Every structure is written in structure tokens, then in C-alpha cells.
Regions:
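Secondary-structure capping and boundary motifs in well-ordered enzyme cores
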Residues: 6, 39-46, 99-106
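Short, contiguous, well-structured surface segments enriched in hydrophobic/aromatic residues
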Residues: 1-38, 61, 113-124
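Histidine-centered, metal-coordinating catalytic motifs and their short helical/loop contexts
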Residues: 42-64
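Contiguous, well-ordered alpha-helical segments that form the cores/surfaces of helical PPI scaffolds
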Residues: 12-16, 45, 52, 108
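Short C-terminal domain-edge/linker segments immediately following a structured domain
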Residues: 34, 48, 83-87
Length: 170
């Protein structure tokens, strides 16, 4: 940091600021320059939420349980997210149930933002292949353990369909 002496390149600055500050930087730059961000602020905020949950070792699988009415997302799922999930061939019933869950909604936003922002084909393919392997190989290794748990199996199926769709689209 000292080596830049007040003239830090933006890519270095972005590496050291908090996620919240990154959100503010994007909003500021868009307002000042007229640039249109490829992602909206709410999606970026949902990415921040899932990132923070993972960074603080929250057990995300516990958050997959059906939520009480008081816990549900008060804001509606944006149309572009619904369309994103619909393009994966996920039916309306599953789509509504899964997107009503806060954690699943955050992960879907993360995948949407990734799909919009990462333009390097090599990077996209590498990470999507890792996600594909996680869902199709690692998580399926002992699927008989979870066969009786409809919540886990349906959530797994949901993310398999979404990931397969992302793999097929590129």
C-alpha cells in the first residue's frame, strides 16, 4: 500500500475495500459518469450477504429450511432473476418455493451476477466446471444418505438444473 503513495490504481483499491464500500463505489461511479452497471444494487447486496455468511462460517445448509412468514424476503424477487431461473427449465412451483428462501435467493443472485460480470471464457468455464463437479460428483457421492430429505434433494436438483443451464449457455 505504501508503494503507491496516494496514487493507488483502482484494481488495487478494489482489492482492499470492503464489499459494502465496493457497492458504494459502483453506485458513485455510475452516478458521476452516467455508466450503467451490468448489475443492480440489490443483486450486489445479496451477493454481499451470501459472501458474509460464508466468510463468517455460517452453516448455510441450516438456512435452507422453510422460513416462517415473518422471516421471508419482504421484497419480491426481481423479474430478471425469475427469468434467469426459468431459462434453466425450472418449473413455476419449484421456482417460487426456492426463490422464497433467503439463502437460496442469495445464491441465485450470486450465480446471476457471476454470469453477467465474468467475461473471461476460461475463468467462467473453470469455475462452472468446478461447480458442476461439486453438484454432480461430490454432492452425489452418497446421495442415498439424503434420499429421505426432500428439502435437500429438491434444493440439490434446483442448483443442478441452474448450473447445467449455465454450462450449456456458454
Amino acid at each position: 500500500m505504501k508503494k503507491y503513495r496516494g496514487e493507488m490504481p483502482i484494481w488495487v483499491f478494489v482489492e482492499v475495500i470492503s464489499f459494502g464500500d465496493l457497492e458504494d463505489l459502483i453506485a458513485f461511479y455510475a452516478a458521476e459518469s452516467g455508466w450503467e452497471s451490468p448489475i443492480d444494487g440489490k443483486s450486489l447486496d445479496r451477493v454481499r450477504q451470501i459472501r458474509n455468511a460464508a466468510a463468517h462460517n455460517n452453516c448455510i445448509i441450516n438456512d435452507l429450511r422453510p422460513e416462517e412468514a415473518s422471516e421471508r424476503n419482504v421484497s419480491r424477487t426481481p423479474r430478471f432473476i425469475t427469468d434467469f431461473v426459468c431459462r434453466a427449465g425450472i418449473g413455476e412451483n419449484m421456482r417460487k418455493k426456492k426463490l422464497a428462501n433467503r439463502r437460496i435467493n442469495q445464491i441465485v443472485h450470486l450465480l446471476y451476477v457471476y454470469n453477467k460480470v465474468v467475461t473471461s471464457e476460461n475463468t467462467r468455464n473453470t469455475r462452472l466446471t468446478e461447480l458442476y463437479d461439486l453438484l454432480h460428483t461430490r454432492m452425489s457421492m452418497h446421495k442415498d444418505y439424503f434420499a429421505g430429505n426432500g428439502l435437500l434433494t429438491s434444493t440439490h436438483e434446483f442448483f443442478v438444473k441452474l448450473t447445467d443451464s449455465l454450462m450449456d449457455s456458454h
